[in-house]
Amino acid sequence: TYYELIKAAILALKERNGSSAQAIKKYILENNKIEFQQTFLR
C-alpha cells in the first residue's frame, strides 16, 4: 500500500526535520518498481 511505501521511505531517509513529499516520491520511485497515480502526487 502507499502507506507502507511512504513509511519505509521516511524511515530510510532519516531526515532530521522530516522528509518532503518530493524526497519521499523520489525514494519510492528509485527503490520500487511502481508508477504513481496522479492522485498520489497531491
From Swiss-Prot:
Its main location: nucleus. GO terms for cellular component: nucleosome; nucleus. It is found in: Nucleus; Chromosome. Pfam families: Linker_histone (PF00538). GO terms for molecular function: DNA binding. SUPFAM superfamilies: Winged helix' DNA-binding domain. Residues 1-42 form the H15 domain. GO terms for biological process: nucleosome assembly. Keywords: Chromosome, DNA-binding, Nucleus. CDD domains: H15 (cd00073). Histones H1 are necessary for the condensation of nucleosome chains into higher-order structures. Belongs to the histone H1/H5 family. This is Histone H1B.
